[in-house]
């Protein structure tokens, strides 16, 4: 169990999946929030729109930390409009150098119509080699399922829905209450 200090268990665990295919990018996330071995909420919203709907993102990790990072990313997107990669690089610089921010425990997947990125507290800003990326405790299950489905006839949203269902059947920290956001890609 992840902990923020020696006494308090951290709210953690989720699955976030991003698929870019056929002119669309889709991010889906489950709704479960766990505290230790207990489910405390089943319908959390871990996927949302940013920058007046031009960017979608999802987070895994400590909820309050992720909301702080979403707010900071929103500010960077206002500072660098239409430049998702630049905004993310500037956010991760702050994340790594600011005393308060560097203690935040979260990962994010974000996308606009042109680029998909993973942001981590280690200072990573990574673009996937393929159109599929996942984070969280069920991320590897969702990623494997999505990769198996991506060459078939399913569209991006259907791949996200089926892959997240598979992850929820395997990962005890992931449920089937999905939030899905979609953007038309370039």
Curated annotation (Swiss-Prot):
Gene Ontology biological-process annotations: proteolysis involved in protein catabolic process
Protein name: ATP-dependent protease subunit HslV
The species this protein was found in: Methylorubrum extorquens (strain PA1) (Methylobacterium extorquens)
GO MF annotations in UniProt: metal ion binding; threonine-type endopeptidase activity
UniProt keyword terms in alphabetical order: Allosteric enzyme, Cytoplasm, Hydrolase, Metal-binding, Protease, Sodium, Threonine protease
A Pfam family per the record: Proteasome
InterPro entries the UniProt entry points to: ATP-dep_Prtase_HsIV_su, Ntn_hydrolases_N, Proteasome_sua/b, Proteasome_suB-type
Top-level taxon: Bacteria
EC number: 3.4.25.2
